[in-house]
A protein has these predicted regions:
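Short, glycine/polar-rich helix-capping loops at beta-to-alpha or helix-loop-helix junctions
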Residues: 92-95, 171-178, 243-248
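C-terminal capping/lid region of NAD(P)-dependent oxidoreductase domains
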Residues: 282, 287-296, 304-323
Length: 323
């Protein structure tokens, strides 16, 4: 089978497209013929050896796919030929991937594969952050940092479903235009306004109830200063490469909670709640509440380009590769 293989940790251009053996499955696994695989910022970090978890080469990156079950182990009840969304630990950037039966979600055959491969990481993380970490309530205000990225765009769409008002922060006009097309309520440019003062103005002096922060760096403290009393700052990642050093006295005087969001670990410790959330996300798509259309669709041969765009901060919206 064709696969994207990391043979040496480093820049994405070191990745190789190789012919390798199909993975073998154990009694609790399914073999999925991959149609589409989602691409995310952590994939770029993983091949560099800079992610929270370091994997020794050689390995196949990629941990969200949509495809068809071609084979299954004896302990698997899902029928052959079922379309599924899968969340493999690694191995997704390939024509076939073996996944534990507990990490696949059956969907209807007419479920769009592009949407299926886009759903797990970005929408799963955002929904977990808003629903379970922030306990977001309809009518609350939400500041989305890095609003044009995969997490940001998923958050904007889910905020609409959950009845939240969004303030979307971006770094360029083309990103602002894309965010507006997704239904962002208010859009601001980091480089053109004072973040704290602008957010205060947009919330009648109160500040925002919730901040989604996949960016990090100095903007994190600016966002914290823009929160309302008893607000919540949700830390999802550090896309700009800088882990912020925040003045903790702000949490005292503002009563703000700084909450970590590691969706991947939560899926392992809370499988039943994960399944519940996925069922809800799939229903949002099937009912038309969520319209997931990846902005960037690459060929598998161009995976390294897709990952480089994350590192260069050129990525807008959700990225997938068609296998």
């Amino acid at each position: 089978m064709k696969a994207v293989v990391c043979t040496k940790l480093g820049e994405p251009n070191l990745l190789e497209i190789k012919e390798v053996d199909k993975p073998t499955i154990n009694k609790d696994e399914v073999l999925i013929k991959v149609e589409v695989a989602g691409v995310n910022f952590p994939d770029a970090l993983l091949v560099q050896g800079k992610y929270q978890i370091v994997i020794d080469p050689p390995f196949i990156p990629g941990n969200e796919v949509c495809g068809i079950i071609e084979d299954k182990g004896e302990n698997v009840d899902i029928p052959l030929g079922t379309k599924v969304i899968g969340i493999p630990p690694i191995g997704g950037f390939a024509e076939f991937v073996a996944i534990n039966k507990n990490l696949v979600i059956p969907v209807n055959m007419n479920f769009d594969s592009l949407a299926g491969a886009s759903l797990p990481i970005n929408y799963g993380t955002s929904y977990y952050a808003l629903k379970r970490r922030a306990n977001a309530q309809s009518g609350e205000s939400l500041l989305v940092l890095g609003a044009s990225g995969g997490i940001g765009t998923a958050t904007i769409q889910l905020a609409k479903v959950m009845g939240l008002k969004t303030i979307c922060a971006v770094g360029s006009d083309d990103k602002a235009e894309y965010v507006k097309s997704l239904g962002g309520d208010e859009i601001l440019r980091y480089d053109q306004v004072d973040l704290k003062e602008t957010v205060k103005e947009l919330t009648d002096g109160k500040g925002v109830d919730i901040v989604i922060d996949p960016v990090g760096g100095e903007v994190s403290e600016q966002a914290l200063r823009a929160t309302a009393f008893n607000g919540r700052l949700l830390v999802i990642g550090f896309a700009n490469g800088e882990i912020p050093k925040i003045s903790l006295n702000l949490t005292l005087v503002k009563g703000v909670s700084i909450v970590g969001v590691w969706w991947g670990r939560w899926t392992n410790t809370s499988p039943h709640e994960t399944a519940e959330d996925f069922s809800e996300l799939v229903s949002f798509v099937e009912s038309g509440k969520l319209n997931i259309v990846p902005k960037n669709n690459y060929k598998i041969e161009d995976t390294s380009i897709a990952l480089e765009n994350f590192l260069n901060r050129k990525n807008i919206g959700k990225t997938v590769i068609s296998v």
